[in-house]
């Protein structure tokens, strides 16, 4: 979740961050999800482990996009979380990123918001260009020194 927050901060996107359990505090969860739209929330990023019902329940109650982050678990390495989040019934979609994929969740949220925000879209384009430049620099270094010396 920290990686998602770092990305949102990088793009200047305001957000709420809470620790809420759909199982251990259902009343608080229902109130949060049902009032998110009136608070101005446009996208929910929900991380969950094990049974991982939080993102799906958010999607059932919140009328706008929900991004689920399956969290790594000790018993099954996060696969339980991944399957729980990705296997949603028809009509209740949850966009799902990789296990512990907070950074991509933040980027996906930014891209969703950028549909109606040209300034944010420009920042995302700059971010993509920065990533491309980073790869080009790594390739130039590889071409210059060869693979034997690349990581030394």
Walk through the language-model features, giving the residues of each.
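C-terminal binding/interaction regions
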Residues: 3-4, 79-152
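Glycine/charged-rich beta-loop-alpha catalytic/anionic-binding loops adjacent to active sites
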Residues: 13-16, 40, 64, 86-94
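Glycine-rich phosphate/diphosphate-binding loop of Rossmann-like nucleotide-binding domains
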Residues: 1-24
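Short glycine/serine/threonine-rich phosphate/pyrophosphate-binding segments
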Residues: 1-2, 25-28, 48-57, 76-79, ...
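Short beta->alpha connector loops at strand-helix junctions that form conserved
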Residues: 19-21, 69-72, 95-98
């Amino acid at each position: 979740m920290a990686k998602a927050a770092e990305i949102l901060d990088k793009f200047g996107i305001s957000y709420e961050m809470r620790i809420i359990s759909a199982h251990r505090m259902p009343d608080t969860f229902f109130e949060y999800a049902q009032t998110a739209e009136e608070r101005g929330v446009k996208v929910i990023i929900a991380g969950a482990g094990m049974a991982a019902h939080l993102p799906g329940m958010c999607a059932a109650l919140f009328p706008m996009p929900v991004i689920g982050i399956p969290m790594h678990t000790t018993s099954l390495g996060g696969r339980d979380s991944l399957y729980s989040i990705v296997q949603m019934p028809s009509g209740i979609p949850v966009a799902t990123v990789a296990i512990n994929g907070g950074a991509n969740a933040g980027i996906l949220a930014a891209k969703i918001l950028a549909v109606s925000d040209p300034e944010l879209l420009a920042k995302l384009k700059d971010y993509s260009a920065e990533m491309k430049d980073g790869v080009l620099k790594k390739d130039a270094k590889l071409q210059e020194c060869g693979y034997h010396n690349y990581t030394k």
